[in-house]
Amino acid sequence: MRTSKRDSILQAALHVVETDGVTAVTYESVAAASGLTKGGLLYHFPSKDALVLALHEHLAERWDHEMINVLGKDPDEATQDERLAAYARVSAPSATGPELLLMLEASTDSELNKPWRRVISRWIPDPAEIDPTDPRALQKMVAYLAADGLWLSESVGACLLYTSDAADDM
């Protein structure tokens, strides 16, 4: 399957984030990285904000699809334990520095955070719904937090501990 120009632009934008950081994403830098003209970018993304939001949506969707592939079925048909296991298996090996930078950016911008929240809410139990007297529910929340901690560790290269066995143990 041929990569669409839109996907190529998003990959180029991700490359810019990887090499120069989120603030370096401009029409000029992405045009240079993608080999397209600024006009070609404007056709797909009418503003820099639209480009950055599309990058967040693209990565969140990719993450969601990876978890669905690991799960092997529709998340709506899976148990919370199955969804959490898929989340843990996908989180650490998919960790990258650019994704961490984008997640940090999204943490302070409600529009950029929406794609990530959509995915997370599908896979992780709402902390407000956790019964603090239920040990199993608390174990699930700890497993979720451990998966996130492992993702963070892997994304900054601080401690590369991931194995598929570690995810299975969560």
Where are these regions (language model features)?
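Helix-turn-helix
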Residues: S8, V16, V22-A50, A54
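Alpha-helical DNA-contacting segments of helix-turn-helix folds
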Residues: V52-L59, E66
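Hydrophobic alpha-helical connector segments
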Residues: E61-L100
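Amphipathic alpha-helical packing segments from all-alpha helical-bundle domains
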Residues: D64-H65, S107-M141
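Hydrophobic alpha-helical segments that form the core
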Residues: E99, T133-G157, S164
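Single conserved hydrophobic/aromatic residue that forms the stacking wall/gate
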Residues: Y162-M170
